[in-house]
Amino acid sequence: MVENSELRKAGLKVTLPRVKILQMLDSAEQRHMSAEDVYKALMESNEDVGLATVYRVLTQFEAAGLVVRHNFDGGHAVFELADGGHHDHMVDLDTNEVIEFTSPEIEALQHKIAEEHGFDLVD
């Protein structure tokens, strides 16, 4: 099972809650999910994982590099699987829809500005 190997590779013990949460994030139509979203989706699937466990596991996943945390909505944290590819986000403030995009022009401009100020971009 892919989830098991991903957890082991990240240095995490394979537990049922971790597997269920990783599966949920991987299969969800919504790419950016809050802990509450994950919890509700698990409940709708009749999975018995508590909200505190969801918060704890998402924090562990973030520390292990399996997910990335974003604070789009006034500090409200959402998580997405870390797929290794860099992309940026735009948020529609009326609908809270998150739009992902990549732009070589923006990336080049960021590197140019960083270089002009003597910085190296790390992310």
Curated annotation (Swiss-Prot):
InterPro entries: FUR, Fur_C, WH-like_DNA-bd_sf, WH_DNA-bd_sf. GO terms for cellular component: cytosol. It comes from the Bacteria. One of its GO terms (molecular function) is DNA-binding transcription factor activity. Keywords: Cytoplasm, DNA-binding, Iron, Metal-binding, Repressor, Transcription, Transcription regulation, Zinc. CDD domains: Fur_like. It is found in: Cytoplasm. Fe cation binds at H86, D88, E107. Residues 84-123 are annotated as: Dimerization. Zn(2+) binds at H32, E80, H89, E100. Its main location: cytoplasm. Pfam families: FUR. Residues 1-83 are annotated as: DNA-binding. Homodimer. Belongs to the Fur family. PANTHER family: FERRIC UPTAKE REGULATION PROTEIN, ZINC UPTAKE REGULATION PROTEIN. Acts as a global negative controlling element, employing Fe(2+) as a cofactor to bind the operator of the repressed genes. NCBIfam families: PRK09462.1 (NF006999). This is Ferric uptake regulation protein. It comes from Pseudomonas fluorescens. The gene is fur.
